[in-house]
UniProtKB/Swiss-Prot annotation:
Function: Participates actively in the response to hyperosmotic and heat shock by preventing the aggregation of stress-denatured proteins, in association with DnaK and GrpE. It is the nucleotide exchange factor for DnaK and may function as a thermosensor. Unfolded proteins bind initially to DnaJ; upon interaction with the DnaJ-bound protein, DnaK hydrolyzes its bound ATP, resulting in the formation of a stable complex. GrpE releases ADP from DnaK; ATP binding to DnaK triggers the release of the substrate protein, thus completing the reaction cycle.
The keyword Secreted is annotated on this UniProt entry: no
Quaternary organization: Homodimer.
Family assignment from sequence similarity: Belongs to the GrpE family.
Disulfide bonds: none
Record organism: Buchnera aphidicola subsp. Acyrthosiphon pisum (strain APS)
A cellular component term, taken from the record's GO annotations: cytosol
GO molecular function list: adenyl-nucleotide exchange factor activity; protein homodimerization activity; protein-folding chaperone binding; unfolded protein binding
Gene Ontology annotations of biological process type: protein folding
Keywords: Chaperone, Cytoplasm, Stress response
UniProt protein name: Protein GrpE 2
InterPro entries documented for this protein: GrpE, GrpE_coiled_coil, GrpE_head
Pfam families listed in its UniProt record: GrpE
């Protein structure tokens, strides 16, 4: 019976060894699978980070495009406004020339001249409301940024380097010189 018992014990041991071996193989397989899962999780996190970075870059790019577009639109607006304002200056000159001529030929009190005066006044008021400034007032210090020197003359009434008279008004808009005022300046 010992022999039978030994064989049974051997079978049990063999069976237990097989079970242990299967357990170990199963544990190894689970460990490998867990490692694969961890690697996949890590890759997923990395990919999510890449996607987030790409999304942030896209948003930043969209904001930059929006900002650049707004700046370009503003620049175009300013350029077109400046161009428009420069085109009005000759009209102002013409109206002023008519008014100056009307005093010379003594038709200053004619209704049409009054209409021209009102038109010029309205136009200058509108430009003033838009931010256009008239440059070239008498007795102001000569400024080469806004004045164009026509000539210098001796003057007892005006301080040296100050405007004696204005041949043509100058105009500025938002610190942009649309036209320099043509002026005569007092000498020292």
């Amino acid at each position: 019976m010992d022999n039978k018992e030994n064989k049974l014990d051997e079978k049990k041991i063999f069976k237990n060894n097989k079970i242990e071996e299967k357990k170990e193989n199963l544990i190894d397989a689970i460990t490998v699978q867990n490692q694969k899962i961890e690697n996949l999780k890590l890759k997923l996190l990395q990919n999510q980070k890449k996607i987030n970075d790409i999304e942030l870059r896209k948003l930043a790019n969209i904001e930059n495009i929006k900002k650049n577009t707004e700046e370009k639109i503003e620049k175009i607006k300013k350029t077109e406004i400046e161009r428009f304002l420069k085109s009005i200056i000759p009209v102002i000159d013409s109206l002023e020339d008519i008014l100056n001529l009307s005093t010379t030929v003594d038709i200053k009190d004619q209704p049409i001249i009054k209409g021209i005066e009102l038109t010029l006044e309205s136009l200058l008021n509108i430009l003033n409301k838009l931010g256009v400034k008239i440059e070239g007032q008498k007795n102001k210090v000569f400024n080469p940024d806004i004045h164009e020197l026509v000539s210098r003359e001796l003057s007892k009434e005006t301080l040296p380097n100050h405007v004696i008279s204005v041949n043509k008004k100058g105009f500025t808009f938002n610190k942009i010189v649309l036209r320099k005022a043509s002026v005569i300046v007092a000498e020292n």
